A protein has these predicted regions:
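Extracellular/lumenal glycoprotein segments
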Residues: 2-217
Length: 217
């Protein structure tokens, strides 16, 4: 069996055994927080049958909405655009650039809006002028060196004393961003389940019944 088939099989099992007491209503972590509804479900306010596999959210101790991706620490959820099927994430430790360097969403239903080649460089602090347009990744480096992340086509403008640490494709919200530090938030998208028509018509989207993953609207 394929991995995707097994995931769907396990999810259908959860649908069949989900308690009926928890109805599938929109919910949030409190206050003016993110509104959570299908295909997302909010633990523990919703049962798993209220949402799609991989779309489970949770509330932090500070009553903020969070998304836990496979092989990753939780991201804070700042916004969900249900019609465009996009979610805006932020790092709770205010160091998104560090998270992006090792970001991997391949085992989740989400994918980046854009992938851009970035070069990570290690530079001696005394070689970087205060007027430099590049900002160090503040949560990396040490007392003598700083790490920078710039688009690979612009890496040659960095001081020649800087050492290339690695070059890799990184997820960004805008392909025009020069410095990875410009990314205050990370937008991801999802293609399945497709509820765009449902959302544009202001209709409710969800499963047709508890024995299928087919979507109704």
């Amino acid at each position: 069996f394929s991995k995707q088939f097994l995931v769907h099989l396990i999810f259908i099992f959860h649908l069949l055994n989900a308690p009926e007491a928890k109805r599938c209503y929109s919910s949030s972590c409190g206050g003016r927080n993110v509104n959570v509804r299908f295909p997302f479900w909010l633990f523990p306010k919703h049962s798993s049958s209220c949402g799609h596999a991989g779309f489970n959210l949770l509330c932090t101790d500070r009553h903020e909405t969070a998304l836990k991706l496979p092989n990753s620490k939780p991201f804070l959820v700042r916004e969900i655009d249900y019609e465009k099927q996009r979610i805006r994430l932020n790092d709770p430790n205010n160091c998104l650039a560090k998270r992006l360097v090792s970001f991997d969403a391949s085992e989740s239903p989400f994918s980046p809006l854009h992938l851009v080649n970035y070069t990570i460089l290690s530079c001696h602090k005394e070689d970087i002028k205060p007027s430099s347009p590049y900002k160090p990744i503040h949560c990396l480096g040490n007392s003598t060196s700083s790490f920078f992340a710039t688009r690979s086509d612009l890496a040659s403008s960095m001081p020649s004393s800087c050492q290339i640490f690695k070059t890799l494709l990184l997820p960004v919200s805008s392909p025009l961003s020069v410095d990875l530090n410009d990314q205050e938030d990370l937008w991801l998208k999802w293609d399945s389940p497709n509820c765009r028509d449902c959302e544009s018509n202001r209709s409710l989207c969800g499963f047709k019944d508890k024995t299928t993953l087919e979507i109704k609207w």
